Design a protein with these regions (language model features):
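C-terminal partner/receptor-binding element of secreted or periplasmic proteins
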Residues: 111-138
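C-terminal motif of bacterial Sec signal peptides marking the signal peptidase cleavage site
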Residues: 12-15
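Mature extracytoplasmic domains of secretory-pathway proteins
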Residues: 48-107
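Structural motif
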Residues: 39-44, 79-86, 108-114, 136-138
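Post-signal peptide N-terminal segment of mature Sec-exported envelope proteins
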Residues: 24-45
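Positively charged n-region of N-terminal signal peptides that target proteins for export
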Residues: 1-4
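Bacterial signal peptide processing site
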Residues: 17-20
Length: 138
């Protein structure tokens, strides 16, 4: 019973936690006409978000495919914003792993609080020669 209570409490806290702030991301990005923000929708609850992440990893979804096409543009700063860090990461990973062409001088901005997510994203970005800016959320 105690384990169930701990599990339910942690799930509730996770569900109530706020996602990355769009304002926080916008303040870190360059203020020029070569900056775009990709708004990533989320499913609304942790279970549905988990299913959405699995779908994005395999099929990409609209946001993942849009990111893959944006990565082909030269001199572009791309911010990824949404209420779910796991969905944001899945979109970023799909875009980086499936971009057929990557433009010159492309940078990607993402807000999160996971060191492992940061390492995964930086590794994928480096493989595609994309400058990754992972802003640690406090």
């Amino acid at each position: 019973m105690k384990k169930l209570f701990v599990l339910l409490t942690s799930t509730l806290l996770f569900a109530c936690s706020s996602g990355p702030s769009l304002d926080q991301l916008a303040t870190q990005m360059p203020k020029d006409n070569r900056s775009v923000m990709l708004q990533v929708p989320e499913a609304g609850n942790p279970v549905s978000n988990g299913m959405l992440v699995a779908t994005i990893r395999t099929a990409g979804g609209t946001s993942g495919k849009r990111l893959a096409s944006l990565l082909a543009t030269d001199n572009l700063h791309i911010g990824i914003a949404g209420n779910s860090q796991s969905v944001n990461k899945a979109v970023a990973m799909y875009g980086l792993n499936n971009a057929e062409k990557v433009g010159k001088n492309v940078s990607l901005y993402l807000v999160g609080d996971s060191q492992s997510d940061k390492a995964d994203l930086e590794k994928a970005a480096k493989a595609k020669n994309v400058e990754m800016h992972y802003i640690m959320q406090k």
